[in-house]
């Protein structure tokens, strides 16, 4: 806003310093966030850091191409990946579709609170934090993928028949992971 307004009034040459300052500030913020993520993962002895695969390609058209995006998702994920590999951790990306939209308990779509956008209401009436629910769903999708990947096709299709939502990863939630795990335990016991 402020830089663009100044650029419109005084020309682009005078505002180059402001753009450079904002860019440096943004880069520094990306470094700090990536470092904090990897440090947190290392403190908790994590083997894998799981990110949502966010759409990071494509060009911005119109007036918005002048706008400097303050959320550096690509830079943060890239820096995290380099730092994690240096420390012997893996980085995995999960499809971001419906992670925030679906409740982790399997009750269906959530309704966001109008006053506090970080809270949501499940179909069951329970109020919960949206980002925490989305984090549960992201972790569940990763574990569902890792549990099903090494299985033979016949065993995998048997489990997918018993727990149908795991067939389509964009609708997987934490409740589906729990069902899948219990079905796998029953299959091992038999």
What is each PLM-predicted segment?
Residues 1-190:
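Positively charged, helix-rich recognition surfaces that bind polyanionic ligands
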């Amino acid at each position: 806003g402020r830089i663009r307004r100044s650029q419109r009034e005084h020309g682009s040459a005078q505002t180059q310093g402001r753009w450079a300052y904002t860019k440096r500030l943004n880069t520094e913020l990306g470094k700090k966030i990536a470092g904090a993520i990897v440090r947190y993962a290392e403190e908790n002895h994590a083997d894998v850091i799981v990110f949502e695969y966010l759409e990071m390609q494509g060009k911005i058209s119109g007036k918005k191409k002048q706008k400097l995006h303050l959320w550096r998702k690509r830079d943060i994920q890239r820096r995290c990946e380099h730092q994690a590999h240096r420390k012997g951790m893996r980085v995995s990306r999960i499809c971001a579709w419906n992670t925030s939209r679906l409740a982790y308990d399997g009750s269906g779509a959530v309704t966001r609170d109008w006053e506090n956008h970080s809270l949501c209401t499940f179909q069951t009436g329970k109020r919960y934090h949206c980002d925490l629910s989305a984090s549960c769903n992201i972790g569940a999708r990763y574990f569902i993928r890792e549990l099903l990947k090494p299985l033979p096709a016949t065993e995998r299709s048997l489990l997918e028949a018993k727990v149908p939502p795991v067939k389509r990863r964009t609708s997987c939630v934490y409740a589906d992971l729990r069902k899948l795990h219990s079905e796998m335990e029953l299959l091992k016991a038999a």
